[in-house]
Regions:
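The feature captures the beta-strand-to-loop junction immediately N-terminal to the Walker
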Residues: 83-85
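Conserved coupling/switch loops of ABC nucleotide-binding domains, chiefly the family-specific signature
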Residues: 104-107, 157, 257, 409
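ABC ATPase nucleotide-binding domains
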Residues: 120-281
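Non-catalytic connector elements of ABC transporters
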Residues: 287, 296-421
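Helix-to-loop junction immediately C-terminal to a conserved catalytic motif
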Residues: 98
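Conserved ABC transporter NBD signature motif
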Residues: 106-114
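Pre-Walker A (P-loop) beta-loop-beta motif of ABC nucleotide-binding domains
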Residues: 70-81
Length: 421
């Protein structure tokens, strides 16, 4: 029983020790105008479709451009998340930092040292992959110790590091097992533990949770947050899942077609998306978009007309438009589902009529899909704020009125750029 009481205390002590600043393992990472081109594998065919290819910004005479004009300064101990759809260049960028992909142009610095031509083993980084990459014939202990053995680290030091990492990750009881005897979450912990024992300057994680089911993803996401707090070093994390990006990152980098679309804290990106793509990509359910018109009254105040209904703008948005001397123009109006409110039938304020298509009961909220003059709109309504008759949902074909305040509207110009960014 004495041992049982001491084990948790020992684990907490190790976690506290791991959380202490370790300046030798901290590193600033700088990517300057990074570009990655995959040369064409076969000669270009001068055919009728060659003109069509030029419409794809990722295909040039050099080849397929996976990443371009990538500029990012990552501070010591910062947790950066690269997020975007498949094929946006996020994993390629991570692999260039790791040295697994050659940099076509630009400069990469880690801890102030140019790394373009430095071999991966000499970059003092550790990478965790999506598929765990564990040796099936080795035990958990042997998997975690393998890189240290290659470095000729003493047996005592290897044993200390492996057991400390195992206690931090709560996998001590699995050290003698083979990977096939572990669950997906346990295997991922082993993969992370193998990276921890190396005590790298930079942790790289390439979609480490993609192979896990929803419940395990939520659990491991929390574990990664705790891990970051304990080992306190620089992280670069790649994911296509915006929930992971929002919950894990100090800052997130949204990518599309090899270009950075926006860099900011999760809240900054959510509150002020730089363009239509970011606005639609970040947030679940995604932002609603309306064809609209930005108007200017005789007194100089701006307002927005949507489906023939006028909506005023908040004072801070008015001022931003005045500062830019914005002219009346056709725009795309964006409003997040949780920022749309229902109005009474006899409401005097501006509102839009719609018919209910689908009502999804989510427990604490209802996701209401409506059709407003041919436009599909999604509302997220807190059940606690709804009248009793609507707390169990809405019926197909019900008529509802909805509106949105002047402080929650996002205005995008004809090029898709946020006019208030």
């Amino acid at each position: 029983m004495e041992t049982c009481r001491k084990a948790p205390e020992r684990r907490e002590a190790l976690r506290a020790e791991a959380a202490e600043p370790r300046s030798e393992n901290m590193a600033e990472v700088i990517l300057k105008n990074i570009k990655k081109v995959y040369p064409n594998s076969e000669p270009k065919k001068r055919s009728k479709d060659s003109g069509e290819k030029k419409h794809n910004l990722q295909i040039t005479d050099e080849g397929v451009v996976a990443v371009q004009e990538f500029n990012l300064d990552i501070a010591d101990r910062e947790f950066i998340v690269l997020v975007g759809p498949s094929g946006c260049g996020k994993s390629t960028t991570l692999r260039m930092v790791a040295g697994l992909e050659e940099i076509s142009a630009g400069e990469l610095y880690i801890d102030g040292k140019l790394m373009n031509d430095v071999a991966p083993k000499d970059r003092d980084i550790a990478m965790v992959f999506q598929n765990y990459a564990l040796y099936p014939h080795m035990t958990v202990y042997e998997n975690m110790a393998f890189s240290l053995k290659l470095k000729k680290v003493s047996k005592d030091e290897i044993d200390r590091k492996v057991r400390e990492a195992a206690e931090i990750l709560d996998i001590t009881q699995y050290l003698d097992r083979k990977p096939k005897a572990l669950s997906g979450g346990q295997r991922q912990r082993v993969a992370i533990g193998r990276a921890i024992v190396r005590e790298p300057q930079v942790f790289l994680m390439d979609e480490p949770l993609s192979n896990l089911d929803a419940k395990l993803r939520n659990q491991m996401r929390a574990e990664i947050i705790k891990l970051r707090q304990r080992i306190d070093t620089t992280f670069i994390y790649v994911t296509h899942d915006q929930t992971e990006a929002m919950t894990l990152g100090d800052r997130i980098v949204v990518m599309k077609d090899g270009f950075i679309q926006q860099i900011g804290t999760p809240q900054q990106v959510f509150d002020t998306p730089s363009n239509l793509f970011v606005a639609g990509f970040i947030g679940t359910p995604q932002m609603n978009f309306f064809d609209a018109r930005l108007q200017k009254a005789e007194n100089g105040d701006y307002y927005v007309t949507v489906q023939g209904v006028d909506f005023g703008l908040a004072p801070d948005k008015q001022q931003l438009l005045r500062d830019k001397n914005a002219a009346p123009q056709d725009i795309t109006l964006g409003v997040r589902p949780e920022h749309i409110m229902l109005c009474a039938e006899d409401a005097s304020e501006s509102h839009i009529k719609a018919k209910v298509d689908v009502s999804e009961m989510m427990g604490s909220s209802i996701h209401l899909h409506v059709n407003a003059d041919g436009k599909d709109v999604v509302l997220v309504l807190a059940t606690v704020d709804l009248p009793q008759e609507h707390r169990l949902g809405f019926r197909f074909g019900d008529t509802v009125n909805f509106a949105f305040g002047g402080n929650v509207m996002h205005l995008f110009d004809a090029e898709g750029k946020n006019m208030l960014y």
